[in-house]
């Protein structure tokens, strides 16, 4: 079966790829909002965008919306319009908070559009005082889904042969890599996907779903930090459905599994996809709540850990764990691998990768060490709250 992640043409890592759950659950073994404002260099002149693939057009200014005219004209209260508004506000809020935490560095911004409609905003901060590399991207994408992918995605009987299926997708995606090895990496992604009726089947019902998640990847375990992070995820989930947190926590543990290493990328959080079995308004509110929970879940941890002293050994361990991050993203992450195979916007696709990483031959931490404790937790997921 073909996942939608493998049929969507997306020019940005921020694109909301539809991801499947992990194929196998591994066996355990021992071992207040602020609006982001452009820096003075942006405010004085047009926003400059890097040249990328042919199907993208660099834009000098941020538009009010990336929606097509027909969508914009229909209603500003549509789910498409409100989701785009939500992710752009979330991008501004997160970027403002990250710049404040860094104390000096500012995001570089690229704005782009596509001839068929849609576009995106990529923001990256690197070599700051706190952040080695931080990327916060949003995108709105229109495209056409091949018939086989539509049948695979929605379970259309094999004797039906719908024509190409127009789709709409929007999302925010971010990966934040701090410099200090005691400060954890964070990833979050929230996305919305719609398909229109197949072109040869007018009147067929529109399909839609939500996906996303927020997960933490530390190099060293501070139990109070991990408990705080998971508590915020649970609070967001419990406002809507008490089964969400345990269900999405396990989904996260299973999805971010590095099969060739037999370990997970980090200490989890929440992850969900193909979510459409609840009221659409409820799920829009849920995705909004999750996005709004990113800063309160993460920034208090950064403030506590960003200035802790560390030594070369601890930095080297962080770089080894960053190597695991690279392995997962380049080998298993559907958004990244699809973008690389289809000629997407390379700078946006690889924004998730850390500025530096490390690989050592047959490295094994000493049993009982702090490094070993982290590895054990990545191999054997724990219930933190």
Curated annotation (Swiss-Prot):
EC number: 1.3.3.3
Enzyme class: oxidoreductase
Residue range covered by the transit peptide: 1-67
Entry keyword set: Chlorophyll biosynthesis, Chloroplast, Heme biosynthesis, Oxidoreductase, Plastid, Porphyrin biosynthesis, Transit peptide
Notes on activation and inhibition: Probably regulated by oxygen tension.
Sequence segments annotated as region (Important for dimerization): 124-133, 325-360
Reactions the enzyme catalyzes: coproporphyrinogen III + O2 + 2 H(+) = protoporphyrinogen IX + 2 CO2 + 2 H2O
Annotated positions binding substrate: 173, 189-191, 343-348
Pfam families: Coprogen_oxidas
Listed GO biological process terms: chlorophyll biosynthetic process; protoporphyrinogen IX biosynthetic process
Endpoints of the signal sequence: none
Active-site residues annotated for this sequence: 187 (proton donor)
Pathway: Porphyrin-containing compound metabolism; protoporphyrin-IX biosynthesis; protoporphyrinogen-IX from coproporphyrinogen-III (O2 route): step 1/1
GO molecular function, one term: coproporphyrinogen oxidase activity
Tissues and organs where the protein is expressed, per its UniProt entry: Highly expressed in nodules and to a lesser extent in leaves. Not detected in roots.
Gene Ontology cellular-component terms listed: chloroplast; cytoplasm
Residues carrying the site annotation Important for dimerization: 260
UniProt superkingdom: Eukaryota
Subcellular location: Plastid, Chloroplast
Sequence similarity: Belongs to the aerobic coproporphyrinogen-III oxidase family.
Function as written in the Swiss-Prot or TrEMBL entry: Involved in the heme and chlorophyll biosynthesis. Catalyzes the aerobic oxidative decarboxylation of propionate groups of rings A and B of coproporphyrinogen-III to yield the vinyl groups in protoporphyrinogen-IX.
Cited NCBIfam families: PRK05330.1 (NF003727)
Description of how the protein assembles with itself and partners: Homodimer.
Protein name: Oxygen-dependent coproporphyrinogen-III oxidase, chloroplastic
Gene (name only): CPX
């Amino acid at each position: 079966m073909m996942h939608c992640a493998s049929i969507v043409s997306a020019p940005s890592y921020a694109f909301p790829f539809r991801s499947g759950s992990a194929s196998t659950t591994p066996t355990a073994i021992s071992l207040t909002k602020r609006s982001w404002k452009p820096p003075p260099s942006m405010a004085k002149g047009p926003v400059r965008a890097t040249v990328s693939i042919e199907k993208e057009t660099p834009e000098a200014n941020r538009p009010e919306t990336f929606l097509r005219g027909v969508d914009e004209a229909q209603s500003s209260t549509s789910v498409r319009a409100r989701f785009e508004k939500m992710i752009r506000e979330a991008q501004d809020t997160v970027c403002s908070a990250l710049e404040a935490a860094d104390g000096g560095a500012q995001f570089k911004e690229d704005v782009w559009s596509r001839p068929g409609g849609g576009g995106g905003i990529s923001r990256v901060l690197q070599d700051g005082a706190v952040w080695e590399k931080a990327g916060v991207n949003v995108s709105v994408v229109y495209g056409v889904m091949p018939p086989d992918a539509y049948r695979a995605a929605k379970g259309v009987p094999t004797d039906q042969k719908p024509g190409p299926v127009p789709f709409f997708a929007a999302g925010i995606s971010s990966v934040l890599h701090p410099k200090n090895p005691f400060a954890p990496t964070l990833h979050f992604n929230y996305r919305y996907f719609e398909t229109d009726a197949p072109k040869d089947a007018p009147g067929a019902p529109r399909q839609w779903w939500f996906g996303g998640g927020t997960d933490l990847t530390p190099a060293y375990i501070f139990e109070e930090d991990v408990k705080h992070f998971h508590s915020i995820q649970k609070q967001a989930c419990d406002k809507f459905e008490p089964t969400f947190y345990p269900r999405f926590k396990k989904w996260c543990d299973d999805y971010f599994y590095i099969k060739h290493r037999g370990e997970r990328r980090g200490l989890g959080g929440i992850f969900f996809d193909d979510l459409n079995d609840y009221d659409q308004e409820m799920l829009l509110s849920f995705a909004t709540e999750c996005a709004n929970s990113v800063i309160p879940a993460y920034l208090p941890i950064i403030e506590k850990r960003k200035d802790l002293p560390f030594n070369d050994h601890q930095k080297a361990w962080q770089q080894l764990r960053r190597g695991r991050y690279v392995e997962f993203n380049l080998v298993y992450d559907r958004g990244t691998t699809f973008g690389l195979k289809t000629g997407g916007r390379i700078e946006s696709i690889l924004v998730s990768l850390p500025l530096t990483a490390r690989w050592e031959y047959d490295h094994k931490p000493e049993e009982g060490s702090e490094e070993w404790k982290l590895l054990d937790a990545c191999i054997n997921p724990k219930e933190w709250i």
